[in-house]
Amino acid sequence: MHSREAIEAYYRAVGTRMAGLPVYNPALAVELLGWRAVEGVGALGVLITPWCMNLFWQPPAEAELPTKGERAVLSLPSGDYECTLHEDESLGRYASASLCSPMQDFPDQAGARAMAEEVLRLVFAESEPPQPAQLTRRALFRRALGGAS
């Protein structure tokens, strides 16, 4: 797993080529939030850049995935996320799912960070099993006697 610092450094270097393009928001900086190892999945976080916000996934080296440019599904307890696979000399194999692009709706880093933190909260949330309907005693007896519930 690459370090948060290495991934941020890579995207800061990419940012030097993106600066000046209409999609580039100079009020924002590169920041990888929530970067953590996830058992059986690899590592995952939300990457903020001045031009996009992505769910950033680095699968384990042994993972069998399609080739670069194709799509793969990241399965987490909160749901399935479709990601595009990338391969880079310095970062190796990783995948991303676009959350926002361009980033002009964010006036500052704090706003982008707040959205990224909410995405992390949702992505790492356990899905809740459906709750059984509350059964009253009256409904239970009605059902037992063959009546409608």
UniProtKB/Swiss-Prot annotation:
Domain of life: Bacteria
InterPro entries from the UniProt entry: NiFe-hyd_HybE (IPR023994), NiFe-hyd_HybE_sf (IPR038530)
Disulphide bridges: none
UniProt similarity note: Belongs to the HupJ family.
UniProt protein name: Hydrogenase expression/formation protein HupT
Organism phylogeny: Bacteria, Pseudomonadati, Pseudomonadota, Gammaproteobacteria, Pseudomonadales
